[in-house]
């Protein structure tokens, strides 16, 4: 069981780069990359809110619950 982050999908849909998003949500590129690559252990609601605001999406567009992570290629 686990949560996967589909940030790269939303970024592609909105045609926004990692650098651009990092600047707009006031995160380092390194921290945003950790989140984008499913390496983050947690995310603050304030960060999630900022990302959703910039990408004009809902948290469910970025975060997805998966019962069996072994079936997902991350």
Region spans (language model):
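A short, Lys/Arg-rich alpha-helix, primarily the initiator
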Residues: 1-16
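DNA major-groove recognition helix of helix-turn-helix
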Residues: 36, 66
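The alpha-helix within a helix-turn-helix
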Residues: 11, 22, 52
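Residues within the helices of the helix-turn-helix
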Residues: 8, 19, 49
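Short, basic-rich loop-to-helix N-cap that marks the start of a DNA-contacting helix
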Residues: 39-50
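Conserved small/polar residues in nucleotide/adenosyl-binding loops
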Residues: 72-74
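Short alpha-helical DNA-recognition segment
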Residues: 16-34
